[in-house]
């Protein structure tokens, strides 16, 4: 299951408290984002990934987040360990997302 922060402070607090996290930056108008959304949901719900906190962030709703201000495109996925960015990629790439999650386990 993933979390959908409603504002910047909620996102920052949740991410700070997550030892391991994957952030999915998306937009409602983005076709590739809609295509990869079910994959992200399935991965976030998988029991073997329960030690990872998953976030879905609407970049239009939270555009003041520093991570959103420097964004090149959506969808973008970012892996964090203890608050430090470990990896990032853009695009609706199922295999890249699965590999990112495996590296965090």
UniProtKB/Swiss-Prot annotation:
GO terms for cellular component: cytosol. Disulfide bonds join 30-33. GO terms for molecular function: disulfide oxidoreductase activity; protein disulfide isomerase activity; protein-disulfide reductase activity. Residues 1-104 form the Thioredoxin domain. The record marks 31-32 as: Contributes to redox potential value. Keywords: Disulfide bond, Electron transport, Redox-active center, Transport. PANTHER family: THIOREDOXIN-LIKE PROTEIN 1 (PTHR46115). The keyword Transport applies. The active site is at residues 30, 33. Participates in various redox reactions through the reversible oxidation of its active center dithiol to a disulfide and catalyzes dithiol-disulfide exchange reactions. The keyword tRNA processing does not apply. PROSITE patterns: THIOREDOXIN_1 (PS00194), THIOREDOXIN_2 (PS51352). Belongs to the thioredoxin family. This is Putative thioredoxin-5.
């Amino acid at each position: 299951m993933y979390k959908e922060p409603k504002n910047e402070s909620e996102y920052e607090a949740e991410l700070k408290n997550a030892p391991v996290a994957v952030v999915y930056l998306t937009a409602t108008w983005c076709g590739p984002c809609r295509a990869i959304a079910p994959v992200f949901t399935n991965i976030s719900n998988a029991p073997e990934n329960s030690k990872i906190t998953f976030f879905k962030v609407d970049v239009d709703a939270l555009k003041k987040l520093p991570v959103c201000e420097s964004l090149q495109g959506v969808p973008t996925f970012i892996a964090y360990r203890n608050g430090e960015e470990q990896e990032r990629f853009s695009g609706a790439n199922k295999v890249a997302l699965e590999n990112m999650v495996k590296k965090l386990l």
